[in-house]
Regions:
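Active-site neighborhood of glycoside hydrolase catalytic domains
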Residues: 1-54, 160
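Substrate-binding clefts and catalytic carboxylate motifs of secreted carbohydrate-active enzymes
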Residues: 27-30, 39-42, 46-52, 66-186
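Low-complexity repetitive segments in secreted/extracellular proteins
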Residues: 56-58
Length: 186
């Protein structure tokens, strides 16, 4: 099922986590807690990786124009309740780095949106368009923000979206939990 994660041109012949998920972890769980059942998680459980009806999902796949959720954008708060997952083992929302981190790697150069050093450290176009769209939709007009304001509002927006998605997962009567993936590191 792990092959569902990769487009055809880059599908690996083997996914190297297989031994950990199917041999090492089950033995470790059984040795330390013989009465606790072990169930491998995505991508090694179920008929296909990210199958929402069984096992866990990486909820990133539900962002975009997914047929079940009808998300239009990654930042559409009102669609989070429609994620059909029992457990999300990975999800998140793009966020900019903290200003102290940005200033550290800029090493005295000017903090500007078009600074190539800033872009090199993770401010790529798709990430920026998601952040900008979320700020525009939920907080203020992105175009009115300077670099400092962008970093501040990006963090606020990321926190709001994480909170909303965590609450949406928590409200499910059959929900078993979720794990947030931080996506604002270098």
């Amino acid at each position: 099922s792990y092959t569902d994660w990769f487009p055809a041109p880059i599908k690996p012949e083997r996914f190297y986590g297989e031994k950990i998920f199917n041999y090492i972890q089950p033995r470790a769980v059984h040795r330390n807690s013989p009465l606790v059942p072990y169930m491998p998680s995505s991508p090694y459980f179920g008929d296909r990786a990210n199958e929402s009806e069984q096992g866990d999902v990486h909820a990133w796949s539900f962002f975009g124009r997914h047929p079940k959720t009808k998300f239009k954008f990654v930042y559409e708060l009102e669609a989070f309740d429609r994620i059909p997952a029992r457990f999300s083992s990975e999800y998140g929302f793009f966020g900019a780095q903290m200003e102290s981190t940005v200033r550290r790697y800029l090493d005295g150069t000017e903090m500007r949106f078009d600074n190539p050093i800033w872009k090199h450290h993770g401010e790529f176009d798709r990430k920026r368009s998601n952040i900008d769209g979320a700020i525009d939709r939920h907080l203020t007009e992105f175009k009115t923000l300077d670099e400092h304001g962008y970093l501040l509002y990006s963090g606020i927006m990321q926190g709001l979206l994480y909170a909303e998605l965590a609450e949406a997962m928590r409200r499910k009567p059959y929900g078993a939990g979720d794990l947030i993936w931080m996506y604002n590191d270098c």
